[in-house]
Structures are given as C-alpha cells and as structure tokens.
UniProtKB/Swiss-Prot annotation:
Source species: Mus musculus
InterPro entries: Redic1-like (IPR027883)
Intracellular or extracellular location(s): Chromosome
Underlying gene: Redic1
RNA-binding keyword on record: yes
Pfam families assigned to the protein according to its UniProt record, in alphabetical order: Redic1-like
Cellular component annotations (GO), alphabetically ordered: chromosome
Tissue: Expressed mainly in testis (at protein level). Expressed in spermatogonia and enriched in spermatocytes; absent in testicular somatic cells (at protein level). No expression or low levels in other tissues.
GO biological process terms, semicolon-separated: meiotic cell cycle
Annotated DNA-binding residue span(s): 1-228
Keyword rRNA-binding: no
Species lineage: Eukaryota, Metazoa, Chordata, Craniata, Vertebrata
Protein name, per record: Regulator of DNA class I crossover intermediates 1
Biological role: Involved in recombination, probably acting by stabilizing recombination intermediates during meiotic crossover formation. Required for normal germline development and fertility. Required for meiotic progression, complete chromosomal synapsis and crossover formation. Binds double-stranded DNA. However, also binds branched DNA molecules, such as those containing a D-loop or Holliday junction structure. Probably not required for formation of DNA double-strand breaks (DSBs).
C-alpha cells in the first residue's frame, strides 16, 4: 500500500540511486588503485566507505607542507576610553587612591600599649613619642594612658564621675606633684569625699615602681550608697612580674595612700579625712576595748539584738579573723552588715584560720575557743539583766502574779533548788561540744516536771518543736533566735538570759494556775512545775526524790543550742499542762516509782507541717496509766493522727 502522496516510491528511488552511485565510485577507485600500483582491497571490506574516504583525505593532507606562518592575535579594546600606551612605563589607573608615603614609626608603637614599662622615681621622664604626632590620631583607641585633665580641681569640687580620656601617652603627675602645683584644689567638709578623688589618687600613687610591669585589669573603687559608714569597696588588681613572667595576685589596701600624704594634701582642714582613713584601715581599734577577746564587736551585737531575723543570713555568709587587733573580713567571703569594711586589707601570708559561726542544726556545735570562767559578779549581772529584759514579755502575755507573797515564795524555791535553775549552771557546760543528731526542722526539747502536791517526779515530757513553724502555736513567744553562737560571750549571755527568763515565766504561770485549786498544798518545787491535778495527791519517799534529782542533774544537756522558745498551755477543768523550760537536749530517763504510786500522764506534743505549708498541726497523745479508786474524773481530748478530736473519760 503506497503512502499518501507517493512518498514511499520517492524514498525507494533515492536508495537505488545511492547504491548505483556507490557502485560507480567503487569502480573508479579500483581503477585508480590499479594505476597507482596499490594492492586492491579485500573483496569483503569490513570498513564503510566513509571511513575509507577519511583515511584517503588524511593521507593526502599529510603530504602537503605547511608553509604558512601563524598570525598574532590583535588586542581588541572593549573600552574605547583607554588608549593603548605607545611607550613602556608604569600605568597609573585613574581609580587608584592618591599615594602618600607613610611616616609612621612602628618602633614607637609599643609605648602606647596599656602594659607600660614602670620606672622608678629617678628614671621618670617623658616618653618618646613619634616624630609625626598626627599619626596618633588614627590610633587613638590604643592610647589609653594615665592622663589627668586640667579640670581635675573642678571635678573634685563638683563630685562628678571621671570620663574616659584618650590622648597622647605620657606619664601623669603623682599626687604630691599635683598638690604642690595646685595648692588650693579640693576643699572638703563633713568627711564626705567624691568618688573621683580616691580613684585618681590611687591610680597615680604607686603606679611607677621598679622592675615590675603593672596591668590593672579591674581596679576601680566603688563607694557604697551609705554615706554614714563611709565604706569603700575595692577589687583586686593583677600584678605581672617582669622576672618570672607570671601573674600573681596582690592584696592592695582599700586606700593606697599614706598618712603623711593625706596630711600634705589636706593641710588646712584635713584632720577629719585623716581620722576617717584611720577608721577605715583600722576599724576595730575604736570599737573594741583592750580586754575584749570576742570575735564580734559591740556594734555587731547591738545590731543583732535589734535585727534578730537577719542573724542567720549574716553569719552564714561572713567569717571573721583576728589579726593584731584588726577586724579583717576574709577575702573569699567578703560580706558585711554594719560598719565593717568590705574588701581586702593588706594581710600577711601567715594568717590565722577563719572561725565561721556555726548556724546549722545538723552540724556538730563545737566551741572555737576555750571557755572562759565567769565569777559570781558576772552571773549576778546575768540574772539581773535577764529579769529586766524578759519579765515584761511574760507578764504581758500570761498575766501577772496574784500577790507579792507568791512571788517571794517562788524566788525562795528557786534558791533552794539550784539543780533546776539555769543561772547556777556553770557556763563552761554551755560551751561544751553538742552533737545534734536530729533533723534540722525538728528540735527535741524536754523537761522533767515535779508534782507540786507531794514532791513526786512526773514522767518525762518530750516536745518536738519545728524551728521554722513554731511561731504559730497557741502561746508562742514571738522572739526568734535562729542561730547558734559558739565564740561570743555576749551573745551566749544574752541567749542564756532568754532561756532563764522563759523558764521562770513558765514556772510562775504554772504556779498561778495550780494556786486556784490547792494553793495551801504547794511545796517548794518551783523550777519544773508542769502538771497539777486538783483532785490528785501522791506520796513518795525521800529516796525517790533524791534519785530523780540526781538523774536530772546527770542528764542535763552539756551544751545548749538556742532555738525558738515556745510555751504551750492546755487547760481542761482547771488543769494546765505547760511546757515550761525549753532546753534543747536529749533526755529520756524517768524517775523510778516506788510504793503504791502511779504515773499521772504522759503527753507528747509534736508540731508537724501540713501539706498545704500554711500552719503546723498539733498532734497530742495522752496515755493515762493505772487509775486509783476514789479519784476524780475529768474529760480530756486525745488528738488522733488525722486531726480528729475524740473525748475520753479518764479516772485518775
């Protein structure tokens, strides 16, 4: 079937013509080869005619000689503005900057480095500058040198901050030279001085010393906001030794100025300033007496008595050393509260170790110094100050004693029983080592009560007080003392005053309550009265009383950690259960019961913290023991663990 338009026939005709042409060309080639004497190719050629033709053409071209020379390419200028130079010389492009030869002296650049060479006073002279001073304008950022502007007296008067100066490197004048040149510069009054004075004077005082290269990384003086104390804070400066080529730290004094220098500067009215510097450099010589051996000054004790909640935060952060009657703050922990200098003083290498105050309840309370002996006069002063300071607090919260007769009787009882009196205990025992193996939040406190009727010792009553939450109890004394002082005698006496006064107050209140029931049967047992029942009368032998007193004296705690003192009252049917004396310690002994006597009650009061962290929960458990016939019946409440109250009737 033919294609459309007869295209198939045309293709066939072309193929036939090509075959015929190849045939005739082949015949011509053979005839030529025969004429040239070339061997005729094989009848069955494996190479196509195209390749054969290329081979022939290549042979013909190789026979020809290449006599023509290569032509050099001509440069075509794309930008017609430029002209091709005809002469051989350096080209000057119009876009290049103007060439100016540099006149900088690279050898003098090392003088502008902040690490300057330090010369002695004999070698001080002007530093060689560059020949062309205009070149320093390009490098003014690296020329931070000590330069005192001409407006230095004005800045001293106006109390302005020092502005950063970048100028030609040269040696600034010393303070002595500056004062002699400007005799009327800087008049001060009332001991108040600007910041720029000390910073500039200290910057140029001992800057140039022999055989050292100083690199002051951070040495600005900062003044605190308090203008009364006049404390100045300083940071350490890094000193680079030229011989050993190593950095070492050097403790500089707060004011690198000598006393004669200060007197020369302020000859007219500089007495106040010299006295001020003496107070700063030697702060404790005016506060502490000669016979005072404490590590804490009187000003610190007065501050602590006024601001008791800040005791714990203050003493945990700072430690104190005693070096040649100079109060020095340790360099690692430089925190101060009152008029102490916060910084580093020039202290010799062999310094005494720090004695930090021990404020953790979980640690072992050990005295830092041996206990001092106190005579009878100091103990009497201790008692009088105790009664004067703490008696008003107990009377305002619990009421006054009914009559002067009861007060005199209580005082006589306190004298007859020195075992239970806090003031008669030697203070050496209070300083002894105490091992506090209880939790930090719970302080076991305990007292041994004496039955006021017949002198029978009651069972031991143990109270667990939570030191942080005990302020929300029923009858809490809001006078927190939250730290343990082990080396200051004044603080120890103050704490003992509080303990003794609270002991006496609790005993007075217990006596007042029991006086309503049976005042005529009360005996001479004042110090540890805790529980009195109006319908209970017990008898005991004198041997039992002596044994109980001996056990109490032996088991009394040898050391004392003052915590928050709590007096808890619980009255049911004219019976008051009080936690009279809150002495921290561990005492679990009970006096043996002889004859037909019986235990009255055991009360365990535990203050625990709620899950909501709002207020403590009181958990009381009372265990009544062998009831006696003919005794009265009274209702008591036993608090369960869950906080539910269940009325119970116990016959005693």
């Amino acid at each position: 079937m033919n294609w459309v338009g007869g295209s198939r026939s045309r293709v066939l005709i072309k193929q036939e013509r090509r075959k015929q042409k190849e045939y005739f060309e082949r015949n011509k080639l053979k005839s030529k080869l025969k004429l040239l004497g070339v061997v005729s190719p094989v009848k069955k050629p494996s190479v196509s005619l195209d390749l054969l033709n290329l081979y022939v053409v290549n042979q013909i071209s190789s026979m020809k000689e290449n006599s023509e020379t290569m032509k050099r390419p001509t440069h075509v200028n794309m930008t017609r503005d430029l002209k091709v130079p005809l002469r051989k010389h350096d080209l000057e492009l119009p876009m290049s900057p103007h060439c100016v030869p540099s006149k900088l002296c690279i050898d003098d650049m090392e003088d502008s480095v902040p690490y300057q060479r330090i010369y002695s006073k004999e070698e001080t002279g002007p530093v060689q500058s560059s020949q062309d001073m205009k070149s320093y304008r390009m490098f003014n950022e690296t020329g931070n040198c000590s330069y005192i502007p001409p407006s230095f007296p004005e800045e001293l008067r106006s109390n302005r901050h020092i502005r950063s100066q970048h100028s030609t490197p040269r040696i600034g004048p010393s303070p002595q030279q500056f004062v002699y040149e400007n005799p009327h510069s800087g008049q001060f009054s009332n001991g108040k001085f600007p910041e720029s004075l000390f910073s500039k004077l200290n910057k140029h005082q001992h800057v140039f010393s022999s055989s050292q290269t100083t690199a002051e990384f951070e040495a600005p003086y900062k003044r605190t906001n308090s203008s009364e104390t006049g404390d100045f804070l300083t940071k350490r400066s890094m000193i680079m030794g030229e011989d050993c080529r190593s950095l070492y730290e050097r403790r500089q004094p707060d004011f690198a100025m000598e006393k004669p220098l200060v007197q020369q500067i302020y000859a007219n009215n500089g007495e106040e300033f010299s006295n001020f510097l003496e107070d700063v450099i030697h702060p404790t010589q005016r506060h502490l007496p000669d016979n005072h051996n404490s590590f804490v000054s009187h000003s610190m004790i007065d501050l602590l008595s006024k601001d008791q909640p800040g005791r714990r935060a203050t003493f945990t952060k700072c430690g104190y050393d005693s070096l040649s009657d100079t109060h020095v703050v340790s360099s690692d922990e430089s925190h101060s509260s009152s008029g102490l200098i916060n910084g580093e003083f020039t202290v010799p290498q062999a310094t005494s170790p720090n004695f930090p105050f021990n404020t953790s309840y979980t640690e072992t309370c050990q005295p830092n110094r041996p206990c001092q002996e106190y005579n009878s006069n100091e103990i009497n002063e201790f008692r009088r100050s105790f009664e004067k300071d703490c008696y008003s607090i107990g009377c305002g919260r619990k009421g006054k004693i009914e009559s002067d007769k009861q007060l005199k009787e209580l005082q006589r009882n306190a004298r007859k029983h020195p075992v239970y009196t806090m003031a008669d205990i030697p203070l050496e025992e209070l300083h002894c080592k105490q091992s506090c193996d209880f939790d930090q939040n719970e302080i076991p406190m305990e007292r041994r009560g004496m039955c006021p009727l017949k002198g029978q010792p009651m069972s031991t009553e143990k109270i667990y007080l939570e030191s942080s939450q005990s302020s929300q109890s029923a009858s809490y004394s809001p006078r927190p003392t939250e730290s343990t002082f082990s080396s200051s005698t004044d603080l120890i006496s103050e704490d003992e005053d509080q303990i003794q006064q609270q002991t006496e107050d609790s005993n007075k209140k217990a006596t007042e309550t029991t006086g309503n029931c049976c005042l005529e049967k009360m005996e001479n047992h004042f110090d540890d009265i805790t529980v009195k029942d109006d319908a209970t009368a017990h008898k005991q032998n004198h041997k039992c009383l002596q044994s109980s007193e001996k056990n109490n004296a032996d088991a009394f705690p040898e050391s004392q950690c003052n915590s928050e003192h709590t007096v808890q009252n619980k009255s049911t049917d004219n019976c008051v259960l009080q936690a009279g004396r809150c002495d921290v310690g561990v005492q679990t002994e009970e006096a043996p019961l002889v004859g037909n006597t019986a235990d009255v009650a055991v009360q365990c009061t535990i203050i625990t913290r709620c899950s909501c962290m709002s207020s403590p929960v009181l958990i009381r458990e009372k265990e009544s023991s062998h009831p006696e016939a003919g005794s009265c019946t009274e209702d008591r409440t036993a608090d369960t663990t869950g906080g539910q109250e269940t009325p119970t009737s116990n016959s005693l």
